[in-house]
Amino acid sequence: MSLPIAEILLAGPRGFCAGVERAIDIVELALSVCQPPVYVRKEIVHNRYVVEALRAKGAIFVDELTEVPDDATVIFSAHGISPEVRVEATRRGLRVIDATCPLVTKVHLEAIRYARENYSIVLIGHADHDEVIGTLGEAPDRIHVIAGAEEVERLRVPDPEKIAYLTQTTLSVDDTRDVIDALRRRFPRIVGPSRDDICYATQNRQAAVKRLASDVEVLLIIGAANSSNANRLVEVAQMAGTRAYLINDVRDIRPEWLAGAHRVGVTVGASTPEVLVSQTVEALAGRGVAVREVHVVEEDVRFALPQELDEIAGERGVPLPSRTAMHQSL
């Protein structure tokens, strides 16, 4: 791909968040300490490259528990599950390892608390996203899912004085702020979490895109079409007035997108491995093209592994391998 690009700017931070790293590590560690086969309900994270890499190592991905044999080991994806799924797994005698992101679990616990206190709950998010489906299952009779500020006026709740809001963790910070503002105007006594439900990684990656957007003519976001956080990065860039395109990998790049662009930005969604960044830079960078990192914040978040993995390893007398190189192997 020979193009007159003078400089490639890489957003920082980018790529795997702590929840994704943990989920991938869980699958790899389970494959090393459990008796095969190891099943994973849904995509462990929303990235085809990651899923195919783990499938090649022996993970079996299924859509529903009906595809998992009785007494087998099953891993729940990073996006979380509804209580009904957990109950079904217990009834079937499945050995469960829960890879739900701790920040998603936090939203589930908030939903449970508000429901017990008889609040109507507004969940800001996309109704068809796995994370929202799981959270909705915690209190289906009390949760109302909305995606935009224009839906606020259509909300009907039993007691406007007893209402709370929660958010999907991977939304656009700006769009969510607009929805929350609309909710507060209509329901002045609405309550919400003590801290924003939108995860640190989502906020940091969107801030990095905003910073990069002002310095480039085109921004390429590498991520899956079903990745909420990757799609939000495209929207953030476009709202900043920059041409932005979502690609699965370098093969999706169209030369006409880059016509006349001297500075091109590259970033990836929170479920996308760094190897795809390297491949994209290699394809774009001709002789003499400078590559520069643009950092807005450093990250040092790391989540502990679920207790179930330690228990399984202990039962089998197998020490858990180090996590250091697990997700880096993709």
Identify the role of each PLM range.
Residues 1-268, 274-330:
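The feature marks the mature, well-folded catalytic cores of soluble enzymes
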